[in-house]
Every structure is written in C-alpha cells, then in structure tokens.
C-alpha cells in the first residue's frame, strides 16, 4: 500500500530497512526507532495518539515524516502527510478512517503527497 502513494519502504540514503507491524503496544515497543528505518503500522487509525506517544517515548524523532494511506489502490485513495508530532491531530482534523496504513520515516518525503503535508506552523 505505501507504493500506491509513491512511498518506497527503502531508499538509498533514507532507509536501509523496514518493519511492518500491527499497531499493538507490545509490537510498537519492539520495533527499531532509527532515522534509517521505515515503520509501517497496520490497523493503527484508532491507536494513533497512543502509538505516537510510545514511539516518541522510545526516542523517535518527533519531526519524522509520516503518511496515512487510506483505501490504498482504490479509486478514492487518500494520502495525508505530516510529521510524527502532528499525526494524531492532523488525522483527526481531516477525518482519517480505516482501512488505512501508516508509514513513518524519511521515505515519506519521496511521495508526491509530501508537497501537500499538513504541519501546523510549517
């Protein structure tokens, strides 16, 4: 699904690896939180605030690029991009709904949707 939004999971100079996990606290608590690692969260729309808190508490950079890909590969696909620190509020303000995949990492900046990111104050 990230590919539907033009987001590669790895990219030279941006990400050397990736993890794909469901957005359960015990799984989020074990994934790498490095700038050179892409994180894909499944079934995470209803847990965005908690997931964001866990990741930042573990040392994830709050400025990490983030994308939510709703209804990937469907005619009504929507991609919302922002920064990790803004993700829960932006998702709420635009009405993000499942099914959706959340992508966290510098690879999000490769997506054409990054030009239209929603970051208050930026």
Predicted regions mapped to residue ranges:
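Catalytic cores of RNA-modifying enzymes
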Residues: 1-21
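A contiguous loop/helix-start segment that scaffolds small-molecule binding in enzyme catalytic cores
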Residues: 15-17, 22-122
């Amino acid at each position: 699904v990230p590919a539907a939004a033009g987001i590669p999971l790895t990219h030279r100079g941006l990400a050397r690896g990736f993890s794909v996990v469901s957005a359960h606290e015990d799984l989020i608590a074990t994934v790498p939180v490095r700038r050179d690692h892409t994180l894909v969260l499944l079934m995470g729309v209803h847990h965005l605030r908690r997931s964001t808190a866990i990741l930042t508490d573990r040392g994830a950079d709050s400025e990490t690029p983030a994308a939510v890909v709703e209804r990937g590969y469907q005619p009504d696909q929507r991609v919302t991009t922002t920064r990790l620190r803004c993700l829960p509020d932006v998702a709420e303000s635009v009405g993000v709904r499942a099914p959706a995949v959340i992508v966290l990492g510098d690879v999000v900046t490769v997506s054409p949707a990054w030009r239209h990111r929603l970051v208050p104050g930026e």
